[in-house]
UniProtKB/Swiss-Prot annotation:
Residues annotated to bind K(+): N34, S36, D66, T67
NCBIfam families: PRK05826.1, PRK06354.1, pyruv_kin
Record organism: Staphylococcus aureus (strain NCTC 8325 / PS 47)
Family assignment from sequence similarity: Belongs to the pyruvate kinase family.
Record pathway: Carbohydrate degradation; glycolysis; pyruvate from D-glyceraldehyde 3-phosphate: step 5/5
Superkingdom of the organism of origin: Bacteria
Name this polypeptide is given: Pyruvate kinase
Gene Ontology biological-process annotations: glycolytic process
Catalytically driven reaction(s): pyruvate + ATP = phosphoenolpyruvate + ADP + H(+)
Length: 585
């Protein structure tokens, strides 16, 4: 199972039912909607299509709303484009004007108060660089030297590297978009241009007003956000490393190390992190990724990212399906090359000790040492699954939850396959439900060793405190269990006591109709006892209880239906007999 999740931006190239189905089948886990473009009506159409196709395919696909954010842009230019030439001067005005090579204006009126002489102003993703030469507060104009030539079109982005700006956390448009997202029950909000914790709290305030359970992932795109990352993460559910604007706001050569540090801090807290922007950028035009792009994706996975994101590749590119397949193949290959033993050791040192983390560490170590097929996390809120994912186990993580909302929010978490399963909330019912669901996914089958982890008492968020080891097998018989032990052994069917004489019973489970005092010396040497006679006061029950031997009585036609030399598990607590090694310890 691929562990790294894939986020795809849905746009004109991918909004049809046919293409969304192809993206889901290729590996899309989360659909991103970029609210810098498009109307609410357009986005609603995309949301409806995504959910319709996901339901038809019986797949869980989450939806991420990416806000436009409090960005700075230029106003319109004369004839839609102007030419700025190196060595010339240009005035940046705070009052809206039609742009010319001598003067243009920006949407952010306080820019004049934030910059100083010597500050740099970058236009159009850094393609044009200006340096502030003079500031005229009376005219609300900033005179700049043009450091390199280029064409400037309408409404291009403006970046102020190294400058602390006083932009609001979210704009009115963002607030309207978030309320729309709440109405449409989106799963994640990616908040653009977050600089400080208060920016995230402004979004949380809107969510709390509407009682909406939506995860907030700030996008770190500037130096101020990088500087405040610890405080930002404290109030966030996850993070997006948005390398596009970040590579303009800070020197490009620093981006790789910043990426590693941001991912590491998320890993330490167990919060999901998405690495985004230009990951397979050439696939907007070409059917194959470059070698550098393949290395970029793989290295983000080695850094510890939970998810990798496609932007223009799927929104407007010529090869959206191929881009997702390429991303999937790179992820699978990178994951296969991981040293999971070293990864677990590194994560154990990285993450702070707590009760919940102790369970996560125990599960991950046990899964590694026993080479378990899957870890089944029974979870209400997704917390259990995230706790396990934090330690990057090699085993698949199957998150069994009664909540569709929780399942979708687990879609972004590394290594987690969410499954919606309703069920009773007693501990026994929860365990049985978890095992049955794991088998239904096709990830585990009879004879596979799995770990079940959950919180007890059930139904309470954030109480992960239980781990059980379980070997999957078919139930072949049941009756009344004596004691609470469990045992695995090979059956020896005895119609009379003579069938036991001279036999090594040290690894045997005796199967018989009933017993008397002549059986007792042999039963004492056996691992377990299965009989047809009924009742807790029957000789079989009394002997089993006195000798402390896992026993099941009242098993109909046990002698006839249970074969000799069959490996079975007796679960006395439940009065069940399983074929194979299916012990719950």
């Amino acid at each position: 199972m691929r562990k790294t999740k894939i986020v795809c931006t849905i746009g004109p190239a991918s909004e049809s039912e046919e293409m969304i189905e192809k993206l889901i089948n290729a590996g899309m886990n989360v659909a991103r909607l970029n609210f810098s473009h498009g109307s609410h009506e357009e986005h609603k159409g995309r949301i409806d299509t995504i959910r319709k196709v996901a339901k038809r395919l019986d797949k869980i696909v989450a939806i991420l709303l990416d806000t436009k954010g409090p960005e700075i842009r230029t106003h319109n230019m004369k004839d839609g484009i102007i030419e700025l030439e190196r060595g010339n001067e240009v005035i940046v005005s705070m009052n809206e004007v039609e742009g010319t090579p001598e003067k243009f204006s920006v949407t952010y009126e306080n820019l004049i108060n934030d910059v100083q002489v010597g500050s740099y102003i970058l236009l159009d993703d850094g393609l044009i660089e200006l340096q502030v030469k003079d500031i005229d507060h009376a005219k609300k104009e900033v005179k700049c030297d043009i450091l390199n030539s280029g064409e400037l079109k309408n409404k291009k982005g403006v970046n102020l590297p190294g400058v602390r700006v006083s932009l609001p956390g979210i704009t009115e448009k963002d607030a309207e978009d978030i309320r729309f997202g709440i109405k449409e029950n989106v799963d994640f909000i990616a908040a653009s241009f977050v600089r400080r914790p208060s920016d995230v709290l402004e979004i949380r305030e809107i969510l709390e007003e509407q009682k909406a359970n939506i995860s907030v992932f700030p996008k770190i795109e500037n130096q101020e956000g990088i500087d405040n990352i610890a405080e930002i993460l404290e109030v966030s559910d996850g993070l997006m490393v948005a390398r596009g604007d970040m590579g303009v706001e800070i020197p490009p050569e620093k981006v790789p190390m910043v990426q590693k540090d941001l991912i590491r801090q998320c890993n330490k807290l167990g919060k999901p992190v998405i690495t985004a922007t230009q990951m397979l950028d050439s696939m907007q035009r070409n059917p194959r990724a470059t070698r550098a792009e393949a290395s970029d994706v793989a290295n983000a996975i080695y850094d510890g990212t939970d998810a990798v994101m496609l932007s223009g590749e799927t929104a407007a590119g010529l090869y959206p399906e191929e881009a997702v397949k390429t991303m999937r193949n790179i992820a699978v290959s990178a994951e296969a090359a991981q040293d999971y033993k070293k990864l677990l050791s590194d994560r154990t040192k990285l993450v702070e000790t707590s009760l919940v983390n102790a369970i996560g560490i125990s599960v991950a170590h046990t899964a590694l040492n026993l080479n378990v097929k899957a870890i089944v996390a029974a979870t209400e809120s997704g917390s259990t699954a995230r706790t396990i994912s934090k330690y990057r186990p090699h085993s698949d993580i199957i998150a069994v939850t009664p909540s569709e909302e929780t399942a979708r929010q687990c879609s972004i978490v590394w290594g987690v396959q969410p499954v919606v399963k309703k069920g009773r909330k007693s501990t026994d019912a929860l365990l049985n439900n978890a095992v049955a669901t794991a088998v239904e996914t096709g990830r585990v089958s009879n004879g596979d060793l799995i770990i079940i982890t959950a919180g007890v008492p059930t139904g309470e968020t954030g109480t992960t405190n239980m781990m059980k080891i379980h070997l999957v097998g078919d139930e072949i018989a049941n009756g009344q269990g004596i004691g609470r032990g469990s045992v695995v052994g090979t059956t020896l069917v005895a119609e009379t006591v003579k069938d036991l004489e001279g036999k090594d019973l040290s690894d045997k489970v005796i199967v018989t109709n009933s017993i008397d005092e002549t059986f007792v010396p042999y039963v004492e040497k056996a691992l377990g006892l299965i009989t047809e006679e009924n009742g807790i006061t029957s000789p079989s029950a009394i002997v089993g209880l006195e000798k402390g031997i896992p026993t099941v009585v009242g098993v109909e036609k046990a002698v006839k239906n249970i074969s000799n030399n069959m490996l079975v598990t007796i679960d006395a607590a439940q009065g069940k007999i399983f074929e194979g090694y299916a012990n719950v310890l």
